[in-house]
A protein has these predicted regions:
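Transmembrane signal-anchor hairpin modules in multi-pass inner-membrane enzymes, especially those
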Residues: 1-67, 77, 101-111, 168-177, ...
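Alpha-helical transmembrane segments of multi-pass inner-membrane proteins
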Residues: 33-34, 62-70, 87, 91, ...
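Long extracytoplasmic/lumenal interhelical loops at the membrane interface
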Residues: 134, 237-300, 321-325
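Interfacial transmembrane-helix termini
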Residues: 9-31, 45-54, 63-89, 98-108, ...
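Juxtamembrane membrane-interface segments at transmembrane alpha-helix termini
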Residues: 15-18, 40, 93-98, 122-127, ...
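Hydrophobic alpha-helical transmembrane segments of multi-pass membrane proteins
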Residues: 83, 96, 303-306
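A cytosolic-side transmembrane-helix exit/cap motif
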Residues: 79-80, 99-105, 129-137, 220-228, ...
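Transmembrane alpha-helices of multi-pass inner-membrane enzymes
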Residues: 31-36, 218-219, 338-345, 353-394
């Protein structure tokens, strides 16, 4: 059931009510996944989740979220956000870190994500193609399927792009590389036609990571980057979008300034979940401050942003520390998950990844991949060290 949930992340847009309680198809899948897991483990005699190094910052994050529900003006709305962005995604994390201890399950999970994100990419490419044929493409509000805004589409697809690239760079079989090529062609194309400037910046950062970590591909990546950059300058729609960078920077400066003023007034607890409101240029309502760290601070306070930063940095530290010891078959997943979070870190300088139903679950699935691959690599290294020690030989 975890595979179905991961493949169906965009279906949070399917909404209905159980009486007065709103829900989504994604939330229903998450609840079914967690309940089935708990029942199965209870029958096996397991009464508590696996322990991870992230338990303390996760508890602090959940505490910060709970406080933000109390602080918020709309307690009911804040509780819904708390449930969708924190409680349920964290539950998925603990399910995943148990189930993904086996390598073949990681493979199936990534394939499920590939299938779901590829279908989503095809839908968005079809909508774009229709608009393009009709000469109706607005690069400032790119045509999308299911979602109402292009930036969330781009941010959802970024981990997919990273995992697909990881399969190409580090896949040990021809089949795996071909799957990566097909996945990258679909997810990458849909990502590009969202015309997300923050996304383009994030991809540039991922290319730098690839150049450093994949020396066999270094010359190819440098050459491909040069050709892609030169080619992009010949695409009118791309250049039209890049021409809006100066006013976008001015807009971000205004939003950041307003957010910082709000934080100064509420530095400890923030405004509570759903508390941020800003009329951009007096017309456009903004629900988040277009920066991942400002968003965490203004929504769930100083404790929340500190806890999330700790989790993020710990994931990167553990993942890259284990990288030299990771088995070749697991490198695509570790590199892709780490790369996906790097994409969000860079894109998060100018937008608010994580803060959607799909992306919050997506983050914790990437976290589970990083943890399980890194931990298995470190355990194998430890066993090898024991076997090689003089005491072991004696």
């Amino acid at each position: 059931m975890l595979y179905v949930t991961v493949g169906a992340l965009p279906l949070y847009v399917v909404r209905w009510h159980y009486g007065p309680l709103p829900t989504t198809l994604l939330e229903t899948l998450v609840i079914i996944t967690v309940v089935l897991y708990v029942v199965a483990r209870w029958r096996d005699g397991v009464r508590r989740p696996l322990s991870t190094p992230y338990d303390i910052p996760i508890v602090l994050l959940l505490v910060a979220g709970a406080i933000s529900v109390v602080v918020a003006k709309d307690h009911r709305g804040a509780l819904g956000l708390y449930r969708a962005y924190f409680i349920e995604p964290v539950a998925v994390f603990y399910v995943a870190v148990d189930l993904l201890r086996e390598a073949d399950r990681r493979y199936r999970l990534v394939l499920s994500f590939a299938a779901g994100s590829s279908i989503f990419a095809i839908l968005n490419l079809a909508v774009f193609a229709q608009a393009f044929v009709q000469h109706n493409v607005n690069v400032g509000a790119a045509p999308t399927a299911l979602y109402t805004d292009a930036n969330p589409v781009a941010m959802y697809l970024e981990p997919a792009v990273a995992l697909a690239a990881g399969m190409i760079l580090f896949g040990g079989t021809r089949r795996l590389k071909l799957i990566g090529v097909g996945w990258l062609a679909l997810a990458g194309s849909a990502f590009l036609v969202m015309f997300s400037k923050g996304g383009y910046l994030a991809i540039a950062a991922l290319v730098l990571v690839a150049i450093v970590t994949a020396p066999r591909w270094r010359l190819f990546l440098v050459g491909a980057t040069v050709l892609a950059t030169a080619g992009a300058t010949q695409i009118p729609l791309v250049m039209q979008r890049l021409a809006t960078i100066p006013p976008s920077l001015n807009g971000r400066e205004a939003i950041f300034g307003a957010t910082i003023d709000m934080i100064r007034s509420h530095p400890i607890f923030g405004l509570g979940l759903g508390g941020f409101t800003y009329q951009f240029r007096g017309v456009i309502p903004e629900i988040y401050p277009h920066n991942i760290w400002l968003t965490f601070w203004v929504e769930i306070g100083l404790l929340g942003v500190a806890a999330f930063a700790a989790i993020f940095l710990m994931l990167q530290w553990e993942g890259w520390r284990a990288w030299p010891s990771v088995e070749p078959t697991q490198r695509p997943w570790l590199w892709g998950a780490l790369g996906g979070l790097i994409l969000w870190f860079v894109h998060g300088l100018v937008d608010s990844p994580y803060w959607k139903n799909d992306m919050s679950v997506e983050f914790w699935v990437m976290a589970a991949l990083i943890f399980t691959v890194a931990r298995s690599a470190l355990q194998v290294t430890g066993r090898r060290g024991v076997q090689a020690s003089p005491q072991a030989r004696d």
